[in-house]
A protein has these predicted regions:
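Non-catalytic DNA-recognition/assembly elements of restriction-modification systems
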Residues: 1-44, 128-198, 324-359
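Sequence-specific dsDNA recognition surfaces
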Residues: 16-59, 75-77, 81-88, 186-240, ...
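A short beta-sheet element
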Residues: 44-109, 114-117, 122-126, 232-233, ...
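Glutamine-centric residue-chemistry signal
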Residues: 66, 139, 307-308, 326
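Short hydrophobic/aromatic beta-strand micro-patches
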Residues: 90, 132, 321
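Feature representing long, continuous alpha-helical segments
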Residues: 281, 285, 294, 327-330, ...
Length: 359
């Protein structure tokens, strides 16, 4: 139950229902076979999953996971297509939409699951939740503070992408040389398989390397261990995560887990650690070569291009460039990792401020 302090009451804060400030609308079905590639992002409860040529919402909206990853909160800045595993809301004239976005992040909607078979968030349950709401000018002040941190994260993410694109250009150039040999991934890396259910071993927040986290800036999600319902790979040393899902849209992630923090990866990845005398930066770079993903896409099985999976053995047998003499890539990736570490620290600061400023 929401409670106001005397200071909040005097400052004009009120207690409202979420339905009063965040009325929900159902997303619309759009199966993969009906999607026409375009510039409109398609969102599911897992976040950004695809593109389409038509939108059903415009402007600033908040997308909330309804089925699957329930309670996930995703920001949408412009035209978009939230599918039927989501709700969405544009708020009301009582709220600053960005403040509402941060407010919704304080709720544990996963605890409101109404379906034991398929996790689900009921609209009535959501809209009946109480919220402490400050006056609009205070909402705007809080949103500016938190938004400044997200703006810095976004700027770092753009710089990271630029540097990664440069590395990929280098790889393309190197691949044209007849003097560079190729080796199977299994000859350069160890396939790590240790996994566990986080909530059975951790009490508190974990770093979760998931596909949505990759798609949202390649920064691990900060999630409560008890919200994770399935086994995850243990990440306790630097590694490369190679996604098995949709190889035509490659997700190759160089990961340096933060010391002292429990870190896990989705089982949609395979976990690769470099063998002796193999530099992890070079392993990541050469795994990211475009022809590797193209070859794997040709071998993938699935009902559509958005639901294809490749076998771990096919990944491990893929022939990648031997970059043992490439030092420039290592220096670039060191800077990339520094930016990623800064993003993680900024996200942790933001989340701490959300708890302090909002509750």
């Amino acid at each position: 139950m929401a409670v106001l302090s005397d200071a909040q009451r005097e400052a004009g804060w009120t207690i409202v229902k979420l339905g009063d400030i965040a009325p929900l609308t159902y997303g619309k079905s759009l199966v993969a076979s009906k999607r026409i590639p375009g510039d409109i992002p398609v969102y599911s409860s897992a976040g950004l999953i695809d593109s389409h040529n038509e939108a059903i919402i415009d402007g600033q909206n908040i997308i909330i996971g309804r089925k699957g990853t329930i309670g996930s909160i995703t920001w949408s800045e412009g035209p978009a297509y939230p599918i039927d595993t989501t709700f969405y809301t544009a708020g009301t004239d009582k709220t600053n939409i960005k403040y509402l976005y941060y407010l919704l992040k304080t709720y544990k909607f996963s605890a409101m699951n109404t379906d034991s078979a398929v996790p689900g968030l009921n609209r009535v349950t959501f809209e009946s939740q109480e919220a402490v709401l400050p006056p609009l000018d205070e909402q705007e002040r809080i949103a500016r503070i938190l938004g400044s941190l997200d703006d810095k994260i976004e700027a770092n993410t753009r710089l990271i992408q630029t540097m990664e694109d440069y590395v990929h250009t280098m790889i393309k150039k190197i691949s044209k040389s007849d003097s560079v040999k190729r080796l199977a991934i299994k000859d350069l890396a160890v396939h790590e398989k240790n996994q566990e259910l986080p909530r059975e071993h951790v009490d508190g927040v974990i770093h979760h390397y998931s596909l949505p986290a990759y798609d949202s800036g390649k920064t691990p999600g900060l999630e409560e261990a008890d919200s994770i319902k399935s086994n995850k790979f243990i990440i306790d040393k630097p590694c490369v995560l190679f996604s098995k899902l949709n190889p035509g849209t490659p997700r190759i992630w160089l990961v340096n887990p933060e010391e002292g923090v429990n870190s896990y990866a989705s089982t949609e990845f395979i976990v690769l650690t470099p063998k002796e005398n193999v530099d992890i930066a070079n392993l990541w770079a050469t795994c990211s070569e475009e022809r590797i993903s193209q070859n794997l896409a040709d071998m993938a099985s699935g009902t559509s291009t958005s639901h294809q999976r490749v076998r771990p053995t096919d990944i491990l047998n893929s022939k990648i460039l031997d970059l043992s003499n490439q030092s420039e890539i290592c220096s670039i990736t060191s800077y990339i990792e520094a930016l990623r570490k800064e993003n993680l620290q900024l996200a942790e600061t933001r989340d701490a401020l959300i708890k302090r400023l909002i509750g």
